[in-house]
Amino acid sequence: MFWLVETQEQFDKVQFELGPEIFVLPIQRHPEMHPSIYAPLCLYLRDVTQPKGFLVNYFHPEALQFDPLQVKEYLRTFKKIYTPDKKALSHTYFGTNTYDLNLFEHKEVKKQTHAHSYFSQRYHTEEDLNLIIPIVKHFEQCEIIFDEYLPVIKKYIPNEYHDDLSNVFWFIERNGLKVNSAFERYFDLKRPFLSRYNSYTFTQYNLNTTTGRPSNTFNSLNFAALPKENGSRSVFVPRNDFLLEIDLTAYHPTLIGQMVGYNSPTGDIYEDFAAEYGMDRTEAKGLVFKQLYGHIFDQYKDFEFFKLTQKLIEQIWSTFMKTGKYTVEQTGKVFKQSDLPNMNPQKLFNYVIQHWETYSNVAILKEIIYIINNKETKLVLYTYDAFLLDVNKQDKEEIKQILTVFKDKNLQIKTSYGPDYNTLQPL
């Protein structure tokens, strides 16, 4: 039986071989290249109950090219498509029938064919690395990867939050960030082909972190910590009319207040604390932060917000110590003692808050994406407590709707806009 699909006759036969549930893996030009830049070289398909899979060739030079659009339509017919990284696959095929295995149980497949090890070491700086590797070796590598993930497939349980998480960050990634000609002056990328395409650079969010809070370092550029002092942010410019940043203020205290059921007299926890202990808001903010991320001082332990917070910290820690884990019910995220050495109550609480922050933000992102879907305005960057939009002036009503999303969730925001990411001014 053949394994390489490069003709219509072979593709027709494959359709009789594959059942309703399959494993899919795209092969990019370079294993580290952002999947938005080019279509994949090949696509691996395997029935999860069968002893081997098939490799459909799109652009590898060792075989005839098959139509990617025909395969894309075929993928819509399956009941379930399992893949190691749904977000990555979505740049090739986006569907409600895809399931992310790594979000369910994270795996790092280190085993490689000898060809992959050899060529990757010698030619990792080549844009077309995977075109150099023989196509049969790509097939063999895909078979290895499938074998690693088969145990995960067998116990996989669908998770709506995982779907939402993957979907919203795929939506952001695919837009890219427009940059000007000064980009290379500030950012010396050794392999620009991994993330640059024409006048755009692409972000890539890592969803498999300890807390579940996405990191955003890609191709040596940390988008979550771009320096503000050296002018490097000026290279990020709009494709439309201006950039708009929506920045959440007092976000973690607000989230914690919602979690513990704290009713703020002023609507601002910093103001509440300042009023009760006779200080200005700036001093109150510093003290609240120190205690949320350190420990609650004895002289302030009777402040209602801190009393409720301390009770939650103790509840989380008690569950963690008694059962060996703490599960966030809304997302299914499990913090296990076996994975988290040297843990303490405050540190675990901070982990949970970072995860809750992400859960809250995914809900916000879903609403924003729904509002601007098919509009010229693009959501281009997310940094924990800030959302950056590339705005078209014609979308005024949509921007108003987006601001209402935050108001409806009782979240305080600051907005700023400008001609580049470095010169944003209060709106």
Segments predicted by a language model, with ranges:
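Structural motif corresponding to the C-terminal cap of alpha-helices
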Residues: 153, 176, 368-373
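Short glycine-rich phosphate-binding loop at a beta-alpha junction
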Residues: 79-89, 168, 247, 298, ...
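Polymerase palm active-site segment centered on the conserved acidic dipeptide of motif C
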Residues: 156, 190-193, 393-427
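Acidic, glycine-rich two-metal-ion catalytic cores of nucleic acid-processing enzymes
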Residues: 2-12, 16-19, 25-53, 57-66, ...
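A generic structural signal for alpha->beta connector loops
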Residues: 78, 95, 376, 408-412
